[in-house]
A protein has these predicted regions:
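Terminal domain-initiation and capping elements
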Residues: 1-94
Length: 94
């Protein structure tokens, strides 16, 4: 007996889109603390760049600090939360 495989259409139109790690503004983290957390966690983010991102978070209320594969996004999200940063839920990039 032989069987045939039929290909099912993909139902996830967002397949392959990156995930955003978003830090929210709060009233308990300092610019220096945010910069340290970002530079300690995210690849390619220096302390100086972390200060610029912290300023953006403060002025806008939130910032996408990293975007990429879901597994890495989850790891970075947990690490930043561990530093005490206020995190938005992971979001799919648009």
């Amino acid at each position: 007996m032989t069987s045939t495989l039929t290909e099912r259409p993909r139902t996830d139109s967002d397949l392959g889109k990156p995930w955003n790690v978003i830090v929210l503004n709060d009233n308990h983290n300092t610019f220096q603390g945010v910069a340290f957390a970002l530079s300690s966690t995210l690849p390619g983010v220096s302390y100086e760049r972390g200060l610029k991102i912290a300023d953006r978070i403060h002025n806008i209320g939130r910032a996408v600090v990293w975007s990429g594969h879901k597994e890495a996004a989850e790891l970075y999200w947990e690490s930043l939360r561990g530093f005490g940063l206020t995190m938005a839920p992971l979001e799919r990039a648009s």
